[in-house]
């Protein structure tokens, strides 16, 4: 394992974890750093431009789709960073598509919970191993530039009504999604009260950020000021569990979509 102060700054992406719920993120001082969406179902990734959050988010999407997850993707920048990854995601572009897509996810959570109730079990992962049933794949909703989608500052009443509906669907997903194997990943440049509602952020157990300009910015994401002391190294992140890690440097294989 790397000694303190000697994390590499460029680490090629490895093979996937064999475990369905486990996604590899990078290398920490204790070794490989992974997260398990079974126990920590929802994630917030924050960081300024150039911090490496797009490379990390692309690597996460690449893993979950290759593990068989049905992935909804929302990108307010027009998928510039996801051109090679979007073919196997359902991309939600217009406001109508976003609301319809999120509602379908909420409806799917309800359907899966009814399957569980009918089988006298509490979560869809237990349902999937029952004999004779059709396994229900994991579902991920990935929102890049979440602050652009959710910030109500300067918005019209119509726009605020749209945002309120989006937030309500996202809150439902984060409150009920775990047992249904439905997960939310939000990626943003900042995470203040205007860009990510506090109730939504509180439901996102995994929070990760690159270097923050000040302790106040770090506080809004992690609940402490530690990210202000993080080195300004592209791909260097601090997680809400206190782990500092260098994200894997991922490039989609040439000529290969997901």
Regions found by a protein language model. Name each.
Residues 104, 125-133:
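Conserved alpha-helical scaffold flanking the Walker A/P-loop in AAA+ ATPase domains
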Residues 5-121, 137-214, 222, 227-231, ...:
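P-loop NTPase catalytic phosphate-binding loop
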């Amino acid at each position: 394992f790397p000694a303190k102060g000697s994390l590499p700054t460029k680490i090629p992406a490895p093979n996937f974890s064999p475990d369905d719920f486990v996604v590899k993120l990078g290398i920490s001082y204790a070794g490989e750093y992974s997260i398990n969406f079974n126990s920590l179902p929802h994630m917030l990734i924050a960081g300024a431009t150039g911090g490496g959050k797009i490379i990390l988010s692309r690597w996460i999407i690449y893993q979950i789709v290759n593990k068989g997850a049905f992935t909804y993707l929302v990108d307010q920048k027009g998928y510039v960073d996801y051109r090679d990854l979007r073919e196997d995601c359902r991309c939600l572009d217009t406001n109508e598509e976003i609301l319809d897509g999120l509602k379908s996810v909420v409806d799917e959570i309800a359907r899966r919970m009814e399957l569980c109730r009918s089988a006298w079990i509490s979560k869809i992962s237990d349902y999937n191993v029952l004999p004779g049933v059709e396994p229900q794949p994991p579902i991920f909703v990935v929102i890049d530039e979440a602050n652009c989608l959710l910030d109500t500052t300067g918005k019209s009443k119509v726009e605020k009504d749209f945002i309120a509906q989006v937030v309500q669907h996202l809150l439902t997903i984060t409150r009920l999604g775990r047992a249904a194997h439905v997960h939310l990943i939000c990626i943003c440049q900042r995470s203040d009260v205007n860009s990510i509602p506090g109730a939504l952020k509180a439901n996102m157990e995994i929070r990760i950020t690159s270097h923050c300009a000040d302790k106040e910015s770090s506080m809004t994401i992690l609940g402490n000021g530690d990210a202000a002391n993080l080195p300004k190294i592209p791909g260097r992140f601090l997680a809400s569990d206190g782990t500092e890690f260098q994200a894997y440097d991922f490039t989609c294989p040439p000529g290969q979509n997901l």
